A protein has these predicted regions:
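A generic, well-ordered mixed alpha/beta core segment in the N-terminal half of proteins
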Residues: 85-135, 147
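Short acidic-glycine loop/turn motifs at beta-strand connectors
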Residues: 39-40, 80-81, 125-127, 138-139, ...
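Long, positively charged amphipathic alpha-helical accessory segments at protein N-termini or as interdomain linkers
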Residues: 131, 139-257, 297-341
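FAD-binding core of FAD-dependent oxidoreductases
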Residues: 72-85, 123-126, 134, 138-142
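N-terminal lobe of the biotin/lipoate ligase/transferase fold
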Residues: 1-95
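Internal helical hairpin/lid segments
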Residues: 231, 235, 241-290
């Protein structure tokens, strides 16, 4: 196999997400690409999330923060230059979420941190989250990406992100800040001083930059051990402008809003869902579904299925999703049916 490492100095989230998509669909048959990148002051939401509910959009605009939407599912995250993003890109056969996660865990051990996988897609150190993962697959092409919080501004997380009470309760925590940690706070003091220089004598910006670079190097070494081959460093190829424009567009980032007269919200084990129904008499004329679920294709399928259906429990329960749809789809239909008075 071939292990390709691509690092970029670009900090524009639209360009980076475009690069990630381009690399995904241009990976060779027996190639694992490790893409390492950072975004400057950015809120990134999942494929099916509602930006108006997940983020403080007005504050984001006022502060000149980027708002971006990715192709994968999951929840909203905040990126700054204290955060490192990674993406494992591979075709079916080589793509293995468990092995890729092991690379991250090994990289943490290489810099002196005992980390572990918890929940559906998080990594923790000392019981606190420092890395969240999400996934995308299409026709045999796949990516597994995530964040690694090295020294992210804790004050900016609650400033730009709105986290629902139900989500916090499901995690058993009181606030976003209480459930996350920066790895610079977890690296043993002597090791941190060696990596970043003494605190007080080196600027925080410089120390953070050195810590991020150390984690990048650790990830590369860990990937080489996991896959048993030497990494080949490569430059980022030219990314088509229309792909960059897609990620920067209002249409992609905010989506289409509909007028609605009914809204249903619920948190399942697999994630939260917000359902907006636009009614015409007794029938559903249109609908929008938002979710932080890791699934991506299910919600557009339900949006196509419901219009024209009578708002009646038996009619809704009689609908059939495409073959292969997950059980979560029928849980959503049951939820909508139960809302009928």
């Amino acid at each position: 196999m071939k292990l390709t490492v691509i690092r970029t100095d670009c900090t524009n989230p639209y360009d980076n997400l475009a690069a990630e998509e381009y690399l995904t669909f241009h990976a060779e048959e027996d190639e694992m690409i490790l893409f390492l990148w950072q975004n400057a002051h950015t809120v990134v939401i999942g494929k099916n999330q509602n930006p108006w509910r997940e983020c403080n959009v007005e504050q984001i605009k006022a502060d000149g923060v980027y708002l971006a939407r990715r192709m994968s599912g999951g929840g909203a995250v905040y990126h700054d230059m204290g955060n490192l993003n990674f993406t494992f890109i591979a075709r079916d056969g080589l793509y293995d979420i468990s092995r890729q996660t092991d690379v991250i865990l090994l990289a943490c051990r290489l810099i002196g941190i005992n980390a572990e996988k918890t929940g559906r897609n998080d990594l923790t150190a000392d019981g606190k989250k420092f890395s969240g993962h999400a996934y995308y697959s299409s026709h045999g092409f796949n990516y597994h990406h995530g964040t690694i919080m090295m020294n992210v501004s804790g004050d900016d997380l609650p400033r730009y992100l709105n986290v629902s009470e139900s989500k916090l309760q499901s995690k058993g925590v009181a606030s976003v800040k209480s459930r996350v940690t920066n790895l610079m706070d977890q690296i043993p003091e002597d090791r941190l001083k060696k990596i970043c220089g003494p605190e007080g004598k080196t600027s925080e910006k410089t120390r953070t930059k050195k810590a991020v670079r150390e984690m990048q190097d650790a990830l590369i070494r860990a990937a080489e051990r996991e896959y048993g081959c030497s990494a080949v460093q490569a430059d980022l190829p030219e990314i088509p402008q229309d792909l960059k424009d897609k990620y920067a567009s209002e249409e992609w980032r905010f989506g289409t809003r509909i007028p609605f007269s009914k809204m249903i919200e619920h948190r399942f084990d697999w994630g939260g869902v917000e359902i907006q129904l636009n009614m015409r008499g007794e029938y559903i004329e249109s609908c929008r579904l938002y979710s932080d679920s890791l699934e991506t294709d299910l919600f557009p399928q339900i949006e196509e299925l419901l219009p024209g259906c009578k708002y009646d429990a038996s009619e809704i329960l009689g609908l059939r999703l495409p073959q292969g749809a997950s059980a979560a789809g029928y849980e959503i239909l049951e939820l909508i049916a139960s809302s009928v008075e």
